[in-house]
């Protein structure tokens, strides 16, 4: 029949019946009927069938669907054993949305798009073989984690592993621009190249001289950051993966940059077309000093990056504004202008109300918690990657006189619901570290040498989590309650412990550590101080019950790990980051990331299809009270949960604030009226800062007409 000739299918209609209650009952069984119909009408008749996995592999290699090299690293008998092992796990999709997303977005199809060449088991099979790189034991371990949905590789890794005609295994990058035309030109080229391969790109513009600054002694000659933003926006628009998907980028600017107001104004709905950016995302880098000046209702000075670099000999990004603020103010050689700190705070809140932007990076918080040598200066398209970077020096021939380091994000997620029933929590995490290590080792973005250089030195990855709200609801625990906060802390403590264990094992095996390990807090042992006190253990009876049977490291265990790390090092500079999850959380049938759900029955608008309804995982009469929408929740509860995880995460967490334009009565004690105000957002940002939150992603506002502001999720970076 072929997928393009499908007629009279019933699964969309059956799925849509979920949204039509009968006698007050949600028709959840209709989703199971839709799932069954999808396999019967779509998958089974349009899947190519092979007599054996050997025949399938031979066909896929001959037809140039999968690579040969990684298959040849294994014995033919092992390939059959592994495939049988995966089949024996009896994997089944739990919802129509999960199956639909997998077959629509991830399953390999014939070149004409008419037939499926892969099932979920096949995709897991090729992922495990590819990531294990010839090691049979590791291949079994990785397959075991993915097929039981304890581990989910990020979309680019899961989708492309093993394919002959594939994209990169990573799709998220960070680059820094310095204050010269060679760097600007090189960065534009980098953006084009990264967008071409489907990457979402974070760009730091804080080093660029402001509008009106001198160029070669000519006063008023510089155009500032806004024209450069327009160049980047046009680059992403032009380089769009053969017309399949618009490129995606975010530009970050320090709030003490003189162009900060002009920067924010580019996203306003009434902005002049000459300066307005429609598709580029905005982020602000916020030092502690800004919060202090706003709290005191004082004026703030904005400093010229050109004069700062001239005076101090380093780019603006590498000046600690909080530490040197008074010195910069007093220095007559530093150009500066004044604005009211609270006026800027209000401008940020206004724009977040209007567009969901800017993202916020609390840069001093991030650097205080950073255990490695160097400075974090920015984040990525989803605000969870926080890694040190070094600037480059480029001559007029476009050659690197000094090769800096930029960042690629190698991501994956644990599934909280399924991890909590893992037969061996530690072994599960260690298998994930092996899979992610392969991704970082095999990613070579040669078109952008600074990213390739940074990746080869740091060997970083970002393991995160999804399904927290699903797990809490199924355990009849309210999201944001003390038990939920305690659970989150212990869960992420375990992720930290076991990723450290395996990173140390790999460093010992290979005799290699990440660059400048000896200058890190891991090397001197101070990183472990908070753990060797023994404070991170379950305390409440409920949380003790949840972790019953799961190994919880004691102070002595942490001390032993500290000594091993001091002796043999760590292979990975960074290990943990919590990304926002898109399609992969649906495939895993759990809530996205670690934030609350937005709807008990989520409505998704799918291209060319229409609406698909997705009931929250484990939704039942018993769990409904625990599935409170994020839009009806005090955001301080969400911040508290994220703060508990942040304690253990060496990078960042993609924290979205969910607001209603009309805020429910009694939700926030300072509210006299229901209408959302800029003050509400300012209070919440300050609360997050005081709780140690490193970054804030979107502010999503649910408006009276049922629409959302700021909900246009970035696909390039969502995992």
For each of these PLM feature ranges, what is it?
Residues 1-719:
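Extended catalytic cores of very large enzyme megasubunits
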């Amino acid at each position: 029949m072929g997928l393009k000739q499908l007629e009279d299918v019933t699964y969309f209609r059956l799925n849509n019946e979920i949204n039509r209650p009968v006698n007050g009952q949600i028709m959840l069984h209709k989703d199971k009927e839709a799932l069954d119909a999808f396999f019967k009408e779509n998958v089974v008749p349009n899947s190519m069938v092979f007599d054996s996995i050997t025949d399938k592999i031979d066909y896929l290699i001959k037809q140039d669907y999968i690579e040969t090299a990684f298959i040849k690293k294994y014995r033919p008998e092992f390939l059959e054993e592994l495939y049988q092992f995966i089949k024996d796990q009896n994997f089944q999709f739990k919802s129509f949305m999960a199956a639909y997303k997998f077959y629509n977005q991830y399953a390999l199809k014939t070149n004409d798009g008419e037939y499926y060449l892969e099932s979920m088991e096949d995709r897991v099979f090729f992922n495990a073989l590819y990531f294990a790189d010839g090691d049979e034991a590791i291949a079994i371990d990785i397959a075991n984690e993915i097929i039981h949905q304890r581990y989910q590789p990020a979309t680019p890794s899961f989708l492309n592993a093993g394919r002959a005609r594939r994209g990169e295994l990573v799709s998220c990058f960070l680059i820094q621009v310095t204050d010269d035309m060679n760097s600007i030109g090189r960065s534009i080229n980098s953006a084009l190249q990264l967008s071409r391969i489907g990457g979402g790109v974070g760009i730091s513009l804080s080093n660029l001289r402001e509008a009106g600054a001198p160029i070669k002694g000519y006063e008023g000659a510089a155009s500032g950051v806004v024209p450069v933003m327009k160049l980047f926006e046009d680059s992403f628009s032009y380089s769009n993966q053969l017309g399949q998907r618009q490129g995606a980028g975010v530009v970050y600017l320090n709030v003490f940059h003189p162009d900060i107001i002009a920067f924010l104004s580019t996203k306003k709905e009434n902005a002049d077309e000459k300066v307005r950016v429609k598709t580029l995302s905005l982020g602000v880098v916020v030092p502690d000093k800004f919060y202090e000046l706003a709290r005191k209702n004082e004026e703030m000075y904005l400093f010229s990056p050109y004069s700062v670099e001239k005076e101090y000999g380093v780019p603006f990004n590498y000046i600690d504004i909080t530490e040197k603020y008074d010195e910069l103010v007093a220095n007559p050689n530093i150009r500066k202008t004044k604005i009211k700190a609270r006026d800027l705070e209000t401008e940020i809140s206004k724009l977040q109300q209007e567009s969901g932007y800017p993202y916020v990076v609390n840069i001093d918080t991030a650097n205080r918690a950073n255990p490695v040598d160097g400075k974090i200066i920015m984040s990525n398209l989803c605000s969870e990657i926080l890694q040190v970077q070094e600037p480059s020096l480029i001559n007029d021939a476009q050659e690197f006189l000094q090769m800096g380091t930029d960042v690629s994000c190698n991501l994956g997620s644990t599934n909280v619901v399924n991890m909590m029933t893992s037969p061996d929590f530690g072994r599960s995490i260690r298998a994930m570290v092996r899979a992610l290590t392969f991704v970082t080792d095999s990613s070579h973005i040669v078109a952008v040498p600074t990213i390739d250089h940074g990746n080869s030195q740091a060997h970083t990855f970002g393991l995160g989590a999804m399904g927290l709200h699903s797990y809490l609801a199924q355990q009849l625990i309210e999201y944001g309650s003390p038990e939920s906060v305690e659970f989150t802390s212990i869960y992420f403590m375990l992720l930290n412990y076991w990723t450290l264990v395996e990173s140390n094992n790999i460093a010992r095996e290979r005799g290699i550590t990440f660059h400048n390990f000896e200058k890190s807090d891991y090397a001197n042992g101070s990183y472990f101080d908070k753990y060797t006190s023994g404070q991170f253990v379950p305390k409440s009876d409920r949380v003790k019950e949840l972790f019953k049977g799961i190994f919880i490291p004691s102070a002595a265990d942490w001390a032993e790990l500290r000594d091993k790390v001091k002796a043999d090092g760590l292979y990975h500079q960074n290990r943990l980051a919590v990304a926002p999850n898109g399609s992969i959380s649906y495939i895993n049938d759990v809530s996205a990331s670690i934030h609350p759900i937005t709807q008990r029955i989520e409505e998704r608008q799918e291209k060319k299809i229409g609406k698909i309804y997705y009931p929250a995982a484990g939704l039942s009469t018993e769990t409904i009270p625990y599935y409170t929408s994020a839009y009806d929740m005090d955001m301080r509860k969400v911040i508290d949960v994220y703060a508990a995880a942040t304690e253990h995460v060496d990078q960042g967490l993609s924290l979205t604030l969910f607001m209603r334009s009309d805020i429910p009565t009694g939700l926030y004690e300072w509210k006299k009226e229901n209408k959302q105000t800029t003050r509400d957002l300012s209070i919440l940002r300050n609360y997050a800062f005081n709780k140690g939150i490193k970054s804030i992603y979107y502010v999503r506002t649910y408006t009276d007409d049922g629409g959302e502001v700021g909900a246009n999720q970035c696909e390039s970076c969502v995992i």
